[in-house]
Amino acid sequence: MKNTVNLDKFVELKEKDLQNIQGGEIRQTHNIFFNFFKRR
């Protein structure tokens, strides 16, 4: 459960980053992480 909470916080931070910095690289990283999150 601990990992899930950390992931949620991490995703929140990433979304904030996405809003601040609209870059392709960050988007790609977020997508990879999102796919990994969906798998589990």
Swiss-Prot record:
Q: Which Pfam families match?
A: ComC (PF03047)
- What name does the UniProt record give this protein? Competence-stimulating peptide
MF terms from GO for this chain are: pheromone activity
**The organism sits in which domain of life?**
Bacteria
Taxonomic source organism? Streptococcus mitis
Which keywords fit this entry according to its UniProt record? Competence, Pheromone, Secreted
Q: Which GO terms describe its cellular component?
A: extracellular region
Pro-peptide positions?
A: 1-24
* Residues annotated as signal peptide: none
